[in-house]
From Swiss-Prot:
The gene is ycf33. Its main location: plastid. It is found in: Plastid, Chloroplast. GO terms for cellular component: chloroplast. The keyword Chloroplast applies. This is Uncharacterized protein ycf33. The keyword Plastid applies. InterPro entries: Uncharacterised_Ycf33 (IPR008470). It comes from Skeletonema costatum (Marine centric diatom).
Length: 64
């Protein structure tokens, strides 16, 4: 029975480490784009437009 609880406590650690790995894998290409000055401004502008459009869409969906 002790072995069962040991295995159960491993699942949250595995989930957290998998999510951290996924985020790092997704963000690595963007980190490489930041090394070029021209691409840095394009990436910042695209991110800003994306976040603002997402904000306004969610705001209008909620009805504020």
């Amino acid at each position: 029975m002790n072995n069962f609880w040991t295995n159960i406590t491993r699942y949250p650690r595995f989930f957290i480490s998998s999510m951290i790995g996924l985020v790092l894998i997704i963000l690595t290409p963007f980190r490489n784009l930041f090394k070029t000055p021209k691409l840095r401004w394009i990436l910042i502008l695209f991110s800003l437009v994306f976040i603002l459009s997402l904000y306004f869409i969610i705001r209008s969906m909620v009805g504020l």
